[in-house]
């Protein structure tokens, strides 16, 4: 009895000591909750934006066991949640991640109240609950959808700057409606824009983050149910700006799984107006911690941009021969002068599948027997072949008593040109390979008694040799007197994609080519090998040198040369054909022309760094790829050209006098600075959309004008700053001309400050452009006849000679 009384006393005292938690009505007690629920007032409050990472660091002392919980449930590590002792990170947080988080060490706990809320970006989100509240309707009151807040839908035109977040809303109600968005009258899918978009059905909203000019358009919201349909339209205009950090494509890099010994690949697509710096890093641990004393994480740089690394190469990270130590997080970081962006992905490594033969290995004595038998069989076959050849040789000596046949074999040794000048920029110090064809006389008594035969032996280079069986030749792209270029498909020429076919261009000789033509083609191939690869030059992909005709495989440019490319995009107002049926290609903006100039300058800067002098830089020798990338071509050619429209015939061959610097024209001295002069003429071609330099001027008159200091006028669609850059390139003293490095820096600055909205001025005088119809009235003024380097460019009812400005400012016609 005494024990029962003591037990009753303890129960009563515990009930009295327990605090009471109730709602407003004190007669209805609340069920008891875990103690952690009553410490929310002491928790740290963490507001987080959706999509941003959630980082929590436990202030408690680091003990042997740290436990993280959310709303009382223990958190586990997964592809979004990372737990490293007292550090918790949740990537790309969502509203479902809101709640009460706690870290516990022994008997101590610390709480975090996390609230993931949507940021107000467009100024109209005062009430995000429009149309999202619960309601009940009788079956008799069911009707078609209707708008609940038309005031917030009155603003139909939204004009925002690039890289901002846009939120379009159409709040509606009625039971079971469906919400659909269209862009320009077509279904709007996630893959239609970089980074995708978000649709919040409970708030009737469409959210697009980091908008770009391609997001411009008409967006239609359609709300419907079985009783009817309503729609509302917004017009979105995105104003491009260059001041934003790099944009990384959503979903890249993606999580990857690999087996031990295999390979893994991560891809990171970066979009940036300013030149971005990209690198791949992997976060590591030191002394059991991922963070240093300064709070910054430890990391190891796996891959970074360099001089010889193209943008396509840096955007892909390959992990070869994967091991368990390679498992973990890999991060792509892209930065520019505005800011830094980064995306991460995880590599999961699984053990390699077990080979069933390893469970039952073949005894070593059986292997020895197999190898011995094979070696014996091979030895017997070799002996039989040798005996047969000896018998056949003896028979031929008995049956044939005629004179021996001499076989001429021509070999092509390659030598590097020796430096003979102290000036490192002169043409006498270039690294052009010298190709000589030597003849070797062989005696052969086994051949039939035919006439002498000439053969060519090209040195085998395994690094560049490509199998002819994997090359499929296509249609011709162009040809000269002794050579031609054809389109082809090369299977597996890209070592990163060995099973895919790539469209390439193949250079080859015609049947009537001479030994000098062969030597020139070999010299060009060797020059491209030495120079290496760059984004803005035509790169060598491979060569077929053995077992047939010499094939030199280079990159293919789908849009032809730059001169044709610019002329095809001239507005109709600039043409003289007055062909109303002709539809020009897309109109080019001022920024497009500056971009072309900048890319060519980058390519020439790289060639100059490799001590390569082009000698024939012009728009016709710049090719344009499918993605509008400028690539300099023919930088390894021997300069013995044959083009009557652009070259003056002299005793020394044919020279591109329109583009040549005075020291090259009169003294035959070629340097990097003479290439800078040609670059200035190329700039003039670009800003006249493919115009002919010095139109209608005879050769003899041009020589006189250049010596007197005359220069071409400023093109109509060219700023004063760019024209002064041309004039600097045309300075009479070579050392006073800018270097390509300086030109790249100036053009990069101009390109950064230029917007896409600056279209060409169509009201400018047309005398800067060459007409599209054949020469007529001015042809008689050219005293050079068919050998003239100029195609006279007559203007309707205008004089044939344009104005030229003297260096002292005097204008002469």
Curated annotation (Swiss-Prot):
Positions that bind ATP: 477-485, 507, 555-557, 561
Entry annotation: catalytic residues: 616 (proton acceptor)
Ranges for region Disordered: 119-143, 771-801
Regions that span the bilayer: 368-388
Compartment(s) where it occurs, according to its Swiss-Prot or TrEMBL record: Cell membrane; Golgi apparatus; Cytoplasmic vesicle
Glycosylation sites: 79, 115, 231, 255, 287, 308, 321
Topology Cytoplasmic: residue spans: 389-813
Membrane topology annotation: Single-pass type I membrane protein
Family indicated by similarity: Belongs to the protein kinase superfamily. Tyr protein kinase family. Fibroblast growth factor receptor subfamily.
PANTHER family named among the record's database cross-references: FIBROBLAST GROWTH FACTOR RECEPTOR 2, TYROSINE-PROTEIN KINASE RECEPTOR
Protein name: Fibroblast growth factor receptor 2
Organism: Xenopus laevis (African clawed frog)
Gene name of this polypeptide: fgfr2
